[in-house]
């Protein structure tokens, strides 16, 4: 399969995929137990005792990497690399970036669809800045009843445009002033040196007043059941707040302005 990826991008994906995950050992041992269960139930045609002994020996050795046998290498000359499955849904986006070198892209979409995860992955692969819409919540004086009832207006898109997008469009450094939800105030500015590639991440990043600044836009979606499950795992105490408030606000914005249709590509992360 040819995705037209730059060799440097492929190399970075290979390297990042080799890095040990935080729960890598636990995940491996869970899968080993599943394997043993299948063998014990005669679903797989292997000796249970022999398999258990071999896997226990592998564990005692610290789970060293498994290689093809010398016989297999001599017969088939295998030559391949693996990338982590978390990168697979986004290969089309990587391809676009490698072939078009955009200056600014937007990642909009449903909550718990993986917007932050994607922006973090892109930052690992490319030399870029990431600016988050979550740093631009409304200030207290902006939270009028009229504004909060208007689709897409529960974010400070005016300040985001003036302080982030306009400087970036002029190839200027950015003075990032995050909104602090704990103090309900704007923090002191942080100087972010300009980079040729910038990612704007978060719901409402495709607000009509911001769209013209992007070279490319991505919409991430997720099915309802998976969305709720991810939100439950992320913060069970806030789940009802998301269901009753934030999700309806997002959906009103998406539907009123046909955001999904206006994005260049749509990616469903339900099975990612």
Show the residue positions of the predicted features:
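Long, basic/Gly/Ser/Thr-rich N-terminal segments
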Residues: 1-71
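N-terminal pre-Walker A segment at the start of P-loop NTPase domains
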Residues: 75-100
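Pre-Walker A (Motif I) flank of P-loop NTPase domains
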Residues: 101-105, 195
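P-loop (Walker A) phosphate-binding loop of NTP-binding proteins
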Residues: 110
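Conserved lysine of the Walker
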Residues: 115
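Post-Walker A alpha-helix
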Residues: 118-119
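Conserved nucleotide-sensing/catalytic segment adjacent to the nucleotide-binding pocket
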Residues: 129-132, 138-191, 197-198
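ATP-dependent NMP and nucleoside kinases share a basic, alpha-helical "lid"
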Residues: 186-234
